[in-house]
């Protein structure tokens, strides 16, 4: 609960995620403001450094990777029509994207970090290379991250550190797949940097060394808790 978090000396901001379930930002440092649509919190790191941290959770259906892999889900059909899949997935998440971009463009600081479970791959992942390697069934410019990129949020931390989706697919979905499930990178850290910042690392946290950069100790008790792997991103201020 928020009170339990605050009892540990931490700060927490929770928002309604455009009415699609609560999201929270937890910080060791105090907040100095909240964005108009509540997606972000300004965090005062001291010494005159203030950053904007935003968090979101994309609508979980339609789920485009299922559609394009022959899996019907939530009344959305399996199909090989990429344009249709892009259209319905954009319609499902564009309301969230618009509010995120409103908050982003209202920022009073150049450093902005947006993290979340987007329930959609990055537009940098389903490439010609990924198609040739058998990691994606089609080439797709997924609309949520593409729209955010066009709106000015041009950094994808994992792809900054690991630009090749073939050698480093970075799958965060899912550590407990069924035989028919897909593997996808749904959990992202997007960003814009101030002049004195850089991305130092971005690592997947999960159940084993095969699928994760950081193995969570004693994963067993969490097997039925986490359906996504985590992501740890480190930014450096120089």
Q: Which residues make up each language-model segment?
A:
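Glycine-rich, phosphate-binding/catalytic loops in enzymes
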Residues: 4-10, 70-72, 129-133, 207
């Amino acid at each position: 609960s928020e009170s339990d978090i605050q009892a540990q000396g931490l700060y927490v901001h929770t928002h309604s995620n455009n009415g699609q379930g609560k999201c929270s930002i937890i910080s060791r440092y105090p907040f100095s403001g909240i964005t108009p649509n509540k997606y972000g919190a300004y965090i005062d790191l001291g010494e005159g450094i203030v950053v904007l941290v935003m968090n979101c959770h994309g609508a979980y259906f339609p789920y485009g990777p299922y559609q394009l892999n022959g899996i019907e889900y939530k009344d959305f059909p399996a199909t090989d029509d990429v344009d249709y899949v892009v259209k319905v997935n954009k319609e499902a998440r564009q309301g969230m994207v618009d509010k995120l971009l409103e908050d982003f463009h209202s920022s009073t600081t150049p450093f902005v970090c947006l993290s979340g479970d987007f329930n959609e791959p990055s537009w940098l992942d389903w490439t010609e290379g990924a198609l040739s390697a058998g990691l994606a069934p089609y080439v797709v410019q997924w609309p949520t991250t593409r729209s955010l990129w066009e709106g000015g949020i041009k950094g994808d931390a994992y792809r900054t550190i690991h630009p090749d989706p073939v050698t480093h697919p970075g799958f965060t979905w899912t550590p407990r797949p069924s035989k028919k499930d897909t593997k996808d990178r749904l959990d992202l850290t997007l960003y814009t940097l101030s002049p004195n910042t850089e991305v130092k690392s971005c690592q997947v946290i999960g159940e084993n060394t095969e699928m994760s950069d950081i193995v969570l100790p004693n994963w067993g008790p969490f097997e039925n808790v986490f359906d996504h792997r985590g992501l740890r991103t480190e930014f450096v201020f120089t």
